[in-house]
Amino acid sequence: MLACNDDTSLYLLVKQVTKKEIYSNDLENGNVKRGASTHSLYLIGDPKFCRNNSSKQKSIIILCGPTASGKSYLGHELAKAYNGEIINIDSMQVYKEIPIITASPPKSYKTEILYHLYNFLSMTEDFSVIKYLKLATEKIKEITDRGKLPILIGGTGLYINSLVFGYNNIPDISEDLQAQVRNLHVKIGNIELWGKLEKFDPLAASKINQNDTQRLIRAYEVFMQTGKSIFSFQTLPKEQILSDFNCKIIFLNPERKFLYKTCDERLDKIFKEGAIDEIALIKKQFAPKDYTNLKAVGIKEILAYLNGNLTLDEALNAAQIRTRQYAKRQVTWFKNQIQDKITLEYANQEEFTQTLKNSFKTI
């Protein structure tokens, strides 16, 4: 096993098993392409992946990609190989009530590697990207102080963008004000709250859809707390989180046909392995205001099934369609927004898994 610390270069790869050479420009660009004669995945030992031994920077990996692309498996294997610990960067996997519908890492993984910021928060608690970033920063420091490698895994673009490019440090909202605004929202609903926001902060109202409950409440809270538009904070210098780290971003980009297949299979598995009971329990224990705005794909469809508006097959089919649409949007976002990344392309999960295992045998 290879430990990773300030003085250790990371090299992912290792084994080339096709007859076709990987093109030199792919190596230069830090990309991994499939050879013409096979669909195997290659992880390349790119010297750019980490700085050389003279670097004083600590290393960090961000492993991103669409849902159902194999991030959890690859991240777990990397953590085992490079003495790492894993930090969640998925906005829905923070909630402890929905580990099944969000496909959180299995318990077996957590017995081998330390996992952080998964399933720790009640969905009734207020949470924001700023709160996430503060927690993630603390975990990154704790992990590097132990001489280990932080590996951040997820597909939430807002969180990843804020980690990589910095964030606008909006003042904390008091708990009393949060409670007041949420009670107001329950009483008057989205449209009237949006109307109030328009009076106080027309700029925010012009940019926020009336149906976007989370952003609407957030903008109203910020104005009530600060007297300023939430968008005014975007003109200030951004707080940087990873500027002291040698950060490498690995983007998993399966072929679309295969990605859609894995999306469908994941939803089918989730529905069969407890997601229905998970959402039924939430429906029983919590008020609708606590769960109707959760964005995890499948919750809306299962609620429709539980309310008698869809059959189980219809709910599953609707969830699969929405998952494929979400995965497509994620791929587009990562391609366009994150430029400096290592892209891994593959067309078959079995070959991806086997090649990965073969690669780590040679380290």
Curated annotation (Swiss-Prot):
It comes from the Bacteria. Keywords: ATP-binding, Magnesium, Nucleotide-binding, Transferase, tRNA processing. Its EC number is 2.5.1.75. Its cofactor is Mg(2+). The keyword tRNA processing applies. ATP binds at residues 65-72. Transmembrane segments: none annotated. Substrate binds at residues 67-72. It catalyses: adenosine(37) in tRNA + dimethylallyl diphosphate = N(6)-dimethylallyladenosine(37) in tRNA + diphosphate. Residues 90-93, 214-218 are annotated as: Interaction with substrate tRNA. Coiled coil: none annotated. SUPFAM superfamilies: P-loop containing nucleoside triphosphate hydrolases. Catalyzes the transfer of a dimethylallyl group onto the adenine at position 37 in tRNAs that read codons beginning with uridine, leading to the formation of N6-(dimethylallyl)adenosine (i(6)A). Belongs to the IPP transferase family. Monomer. This is tRNA dimethylallyltransferase. It comes from Rickettsia rickettsii (strain Sheila Smith). The gene is miaA.
